[in-house]
């Protein structure tokens, strides 16, 4: 089985092509303004480097968020378009699940975080489970770093924070004595982790038709909020 991986949920865009059981072909770059065109070019480069053909791709594993709305829409739209054209299914994976999976052997409660901008973070809590996995034990929510820190403090147990959201607001989270931080190398979702989650899902046929895939954003998009603000200012003026 060969999967194409797409992750545009954060400031770092990552793409990969992987045959199960073999090392993946990977490309990562800062998300540019012309992200959609860049994704198409990188996918073509991955195909050339791997010597695979588009017709050999069995599915598309895509990070559906939460994360930066514009980037998510670009990545998910590309995944849906390509999967529809090739007649293959999609494996949707949460950005927070990817971050948490990188810490699956940690005995502490893991809190995965993604910078939500506007002074907030998307986050969810996880615990290690038998068999080398990690399970989400909370809803995916958005909140201020102060609110997240207060929730962690109420747990009265050691917690490992992972993700860019944790490092961006490290000063706030460091006020909680039981907080520990994962390294900056896992600040963003890692494509190999996406593949490790997606392949078992694919083998279990946990697919989603392209037309049914959408982003997980939790709150109104920044674009929608900015539009509402502009409309309100016009009315006041």
Region spans (language model):
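N-terminal beta-alpha supersecondary unit
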Residues: 1-66
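Surface "functional belts" at beta-alpha junctions
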Residues: 22, 34, 89-189, 222, ...
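Generic hydrophobic alpha-helical segments
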Residues: 39, 43-46, 50, 99-100, ...
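Stable alpha-helical structural segments in soluble proteins, enriched in small hydrophobic residues
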Residues: 46-50, 85, 103, 191-202
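DPxDG-like acidic metal-binding loop motif
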Residues: 61-95
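Acyltransferase
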Residues: 182-237
């Amino acid at each position: 089985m060969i999967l194409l991986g797409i992750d545009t949920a954060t400031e770092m865009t990552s793409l990969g092509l992987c045959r199960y059981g073999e090392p993946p072909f990977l490309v990562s770059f800062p998300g540019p303004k012309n992200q959609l065109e860049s994704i198409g070019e990188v996918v073509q480069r991955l195909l050339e480097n791997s010597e695979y053909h588009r017709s050999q791709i069995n599915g598309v594993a895509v990070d559906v968020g939460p994360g930066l709305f514009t980037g998510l829409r670009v990545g998910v739209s590309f995944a849906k378009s390509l999967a529809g054209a090739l007649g293959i299914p999609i494996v949707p994976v949460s950005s927070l699940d990817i971050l948490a999976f990188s810490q699956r052997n940690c005995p502490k409660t893991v809190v995965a975080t993604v910078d939500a901008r506007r002074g907030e973070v998307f986050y969810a809590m996880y615990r290690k489970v038998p068999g080398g996995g990690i399970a989400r034990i909370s809803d995916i929510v958005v909140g201020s770093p102060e609110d997240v820190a207060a929730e962690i403090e109420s747990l009265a147990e050691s917690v490992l924070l992972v993700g860019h959201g944790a490092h961006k607001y490290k000063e706030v989270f460091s006020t909680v004595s039981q907080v520990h931080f994962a390294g900056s190398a896992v600040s963003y979702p890692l494509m190999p982790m996406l593949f490790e989650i997606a392949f078992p899902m694919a083998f279990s046929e946990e697919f989603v038709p392209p037309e049914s895939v959408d982003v997980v954003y939790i709150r109104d998009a920044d674009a929608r909020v900015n539009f509402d603000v502009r409309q309100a200012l016009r009315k006041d003026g």
